[in-house]
């Protein structure tokens, strides 16, 4: 039933009342007219000042003038502006952003610092879970190149400060690890060292021996009495283990020779 049909019904009722000479409105006709008017106001669009259900915009699209619409427009303008900027403008923008970030990080509290690191770690974890093998390799290559460039530019004071921080962080990590984690770390380091030694050139091997000797001399000069005692105990245990393995290897070789001679019938005295 359209709005026009409803109005026609009302007009027909009024004409019937006039033709019957009924000047006063009956309660029944008044109730019928009120019902029809309510129907028109409720179900027909544009019949009242209240918005109709079909006139309400969809919530999936940002409304004009809303915060979501404003942020979407700003992001679009920012993408267009960055696409048109030159390399110098890009470097300037990144430098300003880095300076602002350093300033903001220097003013944050210890709790805010920990929360920021936690958010960054969680975001990196989610990103690395979704990346492919090629993306992971490209990320590692870029990170290694970025680190090499940074190390080439840093001063002696910055380098010393970085080494001290790395050493302190490593000491804390070693103190917090469990015996199982320590054993796994040593095994991984030993395997990585063996792989590196296999692929190194003679010059790299000589440089490695010199570095190891210099590092050992420096360590022996600065070690405490407790460290010296622990080192001697470890050296003695390692020597015993190597001696046992060597004897076991010789025994296995002798057993293999005897077994082969018995199978061939060439063992003397038989």
Swiss-Prot record:
Secretion signal, residue range per the UniProt entry: none
Bias-annotated ranges (Basic and acidic residues): 1-10, 64-74, 83-100, 113-131, 154-169, 182-215, 225-238
Domain of life: Eukaryota
Membrane-traversing stretches: none
Stretches with biased composition (Polar residues): 21-40, 260-270
Disordered as annotated region, ranges: 1-270
Protein name per UniProt: Uncharacterized protein C05D11.13
Record organism: Caenorhabditis elegans
């Amino acid at each position: 039933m359209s709005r026009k049909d409803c109005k026609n019904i009302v007009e027909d009722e009024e004409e019937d009342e006039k033709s019957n000479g009924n000047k006063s409105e009956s309660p029944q006709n008044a109730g019928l007219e009120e019902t029809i008017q309510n129907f028109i106001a409720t179900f027909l669009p544009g019949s009242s000042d209240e918005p109709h259900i079909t006139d309400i915009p969809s919530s999936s699209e940002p409304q004009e003038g809303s915060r979501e619409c404003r942020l979407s427009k700003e992001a679009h303008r920012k993408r267009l502006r960055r696409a048109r900027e030159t390399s110098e403008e890009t470097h300037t923008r990144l430098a300003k952003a880095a300076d602002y970030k350093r300033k903001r990080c220097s003013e944050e509290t210890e709790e805010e610092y920990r929360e920021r690191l936690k958010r960054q770690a969680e975001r990196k974890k989610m990103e690395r879970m979704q990346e492919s093998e090629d993306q992971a390799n490209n990320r590692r290559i870029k990170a290694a190149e970025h680190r090499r460039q940074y190390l080439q530019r840093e001063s002696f004071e910055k380098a010393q400060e970085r080494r001290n921080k790395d050493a302190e962080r490593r000491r804390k990590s070693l103190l917090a690890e469990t015996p199982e984690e320590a054993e796994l770390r040593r095994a991984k380091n030993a395997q990585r060292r063996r792989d590196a030694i296999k692929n190194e050139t003679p010059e790299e091997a000589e440089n490695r021996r010199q570095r190891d000797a210099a590092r050992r001399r420096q360590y022996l000069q600065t070690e405490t009495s407790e460290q010296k005692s622990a080192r001697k105990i470890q050296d003695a245990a390692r020597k015993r283990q190597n001696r046992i393995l060597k004897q076991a290897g010789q025994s296995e070789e002798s057993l293999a020779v005897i077994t082969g001679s018995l199978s061939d019938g060439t063992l003397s005295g038989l």
